[in-house]
Amino acid sequence: VTFINRSDGVCVARAQRLVLATGCRERTREMLTVPGFRPAGIFTAGLAQEMVNIYGLMPGKKIVVVGSGDIGLIMARRLTLEGSQVLAVLEIQPQLSGLIRNKVQCLDDFNIPLYLEHELLEILGKNRVEGIRYRDVKGQKEVYMKCDAVLFSVGLIPERDLLIDQEMTPSNEVRLAGNANYVHELVDHATKESEKIGQEIAQELLGAKNV
């Protein structure tokens, strides 16, 4: 395995097992092929979370969340508490993709509307987001909504590019752990799965029954 660290630079290590615990990444606006320009004010929910929590920056004043993933629901509440107005959460599916408890605690408790079976059609604005067009997928009625920021919370993808680039597949020698294996609903589940894999590998390599 070739890797890099700050103290030693490029290093090479021999290993009998490789565990890929690279987590997952957010789906982006580009993956949805949403028409429109690329103005300022378009973020993934995770990026908005980093902006607010770490840098103290707000993505906008009037915000629309596209998708009902848990990070998006949590950020809808957080941005409301920070003083922004979350105008709506749009979800193209007939059901919520996040946890029900997050809908109750993050949307219902703060009177943030959730529009199921509604599709984002276009993001408007050249320099800065000025609004969006969306529609009801059943009635096909198009609506314009003025806003200055759009957050995407449309799912997570296991991060496996390292395996793909090396033309490798998971095996007994190459394991996937946590969200790199599949996206878990709770981080505790990913942690427990990773601990189990670590114990299994230790038993295989050390031949021990209790590790």
Q: Predicted segment positions?
A:
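Residues forming the flavin
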Residues: 1-211
